[in-house]
Amino acid sequence: MPTVTLDRDHLYERLGKTYSQEEFELLCFEFGVELDDVTSAYQRAKDMNKNLTAKELEKYDQSVEYAIDVPANRYDLLCMEGMARALRIFLGLEKTPSFTLVEPTKRLKMTVESDSTDAIRPFCVCAVLRGVSFEDPRVYNSFIDLQDKLHQNICRRRTLVAIGTHDLDTLAPQFTYRAEPRD
């Protein structure tokens, strides 16, 4: 089972309630996930390197983190936003979202050089997500963590799929997908 590590207080903030650990474990059980570990970056660093001094340990965050095992088919739960949304829906605090595919006013073109990519990754899919903000560093870090979890799990350590994300506002079209020789 994949595991997602979430800041407890941030999760409770998104759920709109502070739970005791027992209450949260029960919520996890009822929802179908398992609270696997309660830790912190500080505790992990301390456990992994017994030789760290108190001064060296000061740089590690002591915020409580929950490591939650999620079912292998629930990739939406591998980030703070997905877990919080799913739990809020389960608790009846939020309705299931409805997403709409919108035709763009201007289409962008991706050129695929299939001669170089067919043997390595024969498929290429692109999407533009608008209205996404990464101003909150927690959201950006969660997004990067989700991308990494997907790479490690469903993408089979990038052997099947590699996900690239780019800020379209900082790029100029023409886009080309091709395979380059290793350096």
Language model features by range: what are they?
Residues 1-183:
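RNA/tRNA-interacting regions in translation and RNA-turnover enzymes
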